[in-house]
Amino acid sequence: MKHTAISERAKEEISSIRVGTSCKIVLVSPDDIPYIWESVEPHLEAMEPHSEGELAPEDFYEAIHNGEMQLWLAVEGKELLASMVTQIVTYPRKTILRIISIGGDNMEKWLGYIPLIEDWALSMGCTSLECWGRKGWLKVLKDWKCSYHIITKDLTSRMH
């Protein structure tokens, strides 16, 4: 399935879902990225120190704008509480929704939307979720498990 088809299906499936009484989750249309990016970018910049340098905010911008990734926002009134970037990944034997970046404030207000993201993932043909994150996420994502660890070694010092 092409990413553009995923983007079109995404727009059909969800535009805004209420979470609780005061917070809602919004799947942002790729066309709207230029208009909201300035508000979202600080959440994605906060992720960088916890990564291995795979992606920077400008990389997210391009991938979301091109429909290769999805941007979700948790908002309360006019306040942006959190931003999350996902990507549908097709492996040879399964399709998953990968949470690549998630961060913001007042987690207790927006964490409850995860089951709605799960429903959206199912509607997109995904059979599971995968999250790139720190170990601390396991404390709040109670029904998730640590499937494996990714270990890394930096080789840039050996490059000529």
Across the structure, where does each feature detected by a protein language model lie?
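Active-site/acyl-donor-binding loops of N-acyltransferases
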Residues: 2-10, 131-160
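Conserved donor-binding loop and adjoining core beta-sheet/short helix segment
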Residues: 66-107
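A residue-level signal for beta-strand positions that form part of recognition/binding surfaces
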Residues: 22, 96, 148
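Short amphipathic alpha-helix that is part of the acyltransferase structural core
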Residues: 2-55
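Acyl-donor binding region in acyl/amide transferases
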Residues: 92-143
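Structural motif
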Residues: 64, 76, 119-121
